[in-house]
UniProtKB/Swiss-Prot annotation:
Gene Ontology molecular-function annotations: ATP binding; metal ion binding; methionine adenosyltransferase activity
Cofactor entry: Mn(2+); Mg(2+); Co(2+); K(+)
The protein, known as: S-adenosylmethionine synthase 3
Binding site for ATP: 15, 167-169, 235-238, 246, 252-253, 269, 273, 277
Record localization: Cytoplasm
Catalysed conversion reaction: L-methionine + ATP + H2O = S-adenosyl-L-methionine + phosphate + diphosphate
Residues the record lists as binding Mg(2+): 9
Enzyme Commission number: 2.5.1.6
Function summary: Catalyzes the formation of S-adenosylmethionine from methionine and ATP. The reaction comprises two steps that are both catalyzed by the same enzyme: formation of S-adenosylmethionine (AdoMet) and triphosphate, and subsequent hydrolysis of the triphosphate.
């Protein structure tokens, strides 16, 4: 059996780039909660003792940007300079302007257009991917890396590993077998965890706790064997972290947000963007399409691409590839996808309920991945029953 290795990485919520994603999405939540028609393009950057929020927002909502920044930092665990940022004493800068009237008239006619008339907020192409190798219909390498990161945060916050600090990264290499285009995981080849820690803990304690409390509960035993390689804090020291260790910026973890390097990516980030931004809404609808194709048994693996022009409601193109795993020809599956999914941005927003903010709805997406999550707020994860009678006629 010929196998190959594939690697995916993740970072947890205390990574400076992910901190920025979460702040941007917390701002989006606050705007949409009060005004579902808010037009939001919110970027965040951070460095030692500083968080800056900037971008273009047109909203009727009354938003306390500084409070959102401080609350988000505090909830992650940035409560002192020692851990990388002090939520209550860091400097917060806000540079927010209104959405360009040129964009507003072209996309939504200054809020006068009907949902089916709303154009894409920009040009671009987005990809959705699904695979039958996990219950989540996501790549195993990505699922495991993401869950390790989430578990790191869990054992930090519940006190199981009190030496942990907010920042951390994970990476998992999986050995795969290609079964006529479908991906079959064989074993976990390598597990890498680099986590921020306090001064009190030894490297031996770190390695023991990570194996016992993070790796064992996350990675199924069947994937681990005596040959599995573990790199646990291989640099030897990771005390300085968060924005003190590295600058952070919204939209720099787009592969972690999606499929861990599998499938493809059009390059657009998600966080801080309202649903007229097809970088986000377009990527969500093609994930639902790809997942529905696989979950309905039409293929074992599927990628869907959609593309847009600014101000134009209808997509320019829709593409489907099942990597040779389709039960019917790809052109038939494409026909089914087009019949069952409305790719117009205004209709995506309605069908996936993307104008609803509040309660951390989009904040939740900003750490541990936008896809493969078991949460009713992740409406794009709902599998649509696909009617294929027409396509097979």
């Amino acid at each position: 059996m010929e196998t190959f290795l594939f690697t995916s990485e993740s970072v947890n919520e205390g990574h400076p780039d992910k901190l920025c994603d979460q702040i941007s999405d917390a701002v989006l939540d606050a705007c949409l909660e009060q005004d579902p028609e808010s037009k939001v393009a919110c970027e965040t950057c951070t460095k030692t003792n500083l968080v800056m929020v900037f971008g273009e927002i047109t909203t009727k909502a009354n938003v306390d940007y500084e409070k959102i920044v401080r609350d988000t930092c505090r909830n992650i665990g940035f409560i002192s300079d020692d851990v990388g940022l002090d939520a209550d004493n860091c400097k917060v800068l806000v540079y927010i302007e209104q959405q360009s009237p040129d964009i507003a008239q072209g996309v939504h006619g200054h809020l006068t257009k009907q949902p089916e008339e709303i154009g894409a907020g920009d040009q671009g192409h987005m990809f959705g991917y699904a695979t039958d190798e996990t219950p989540e219909f996501m790549p195993l390498s990505h699922v495991l890396a993401t869950k390790l990161g989430a578990r790191l945060t869990e054992v930090r916050k519940n006190g199981t590993c009190p030496w942990l600090r907010p920042d951390g990264k994970t990476q998992v290499t999986v050995e795969y077998y290609n079964e006529n285009g479908a991906m079959v995981p064989v074993r976990v080849h390598t597990v890498l965890i680099s986590t921020q820690h306090d001064e009190t803990v030894t490297n031996d304690e770190i390695a023991h706790d990570l194996k016992e409390h993070v790796i064992k509960p996350v990675i199924p035993e069947k994937y681990l064997d005596e040959k599995t390689i573990f790199h646990l804090n291989p640099s030897g020291r990771f005390v300085i972290g968060g924005p003190h260790g590295d600058a952070g910026l919204t939209g720099r973890k787009i592969i972690i947000d999606t499929y861990g390097g599998w499938g493809a990516h059009g390059g657009g980030a998600f966080s801080g963007k309202d649903p007229t931004k097809v970088d986000r809404s377009g990527a969500y609808i093609v994930r639902q399409a790809a997942k529905s194709v696989v979950a309905n048994g039409l293929a074992r693996r599927c990628i869907v691409q959609v593309s847009y022009a600014i101000g134009v409601p209808e997509p320019l193109s829709v593409f489907v590839d099942t990597y040779g795993t389709g039960m019917i020809p790809d052109k038939e599956i494409l026909k089914i996808v087009k019949e069952n999914f409305d790719f117009r941005p205004g209709m995506i927003a309605i069908n996936l309920d993307l104008k609803r903010g509040g309660n951390g709805r989009f904040l939740k997406t900003a750490a541990y991945g936008h896809f493969g999550r078991d949460d009713t707020d992740f409406t794009w994860e709902v599998v649509k029953p696909l009617k294929c009678e027409k396509a097979q006629d």
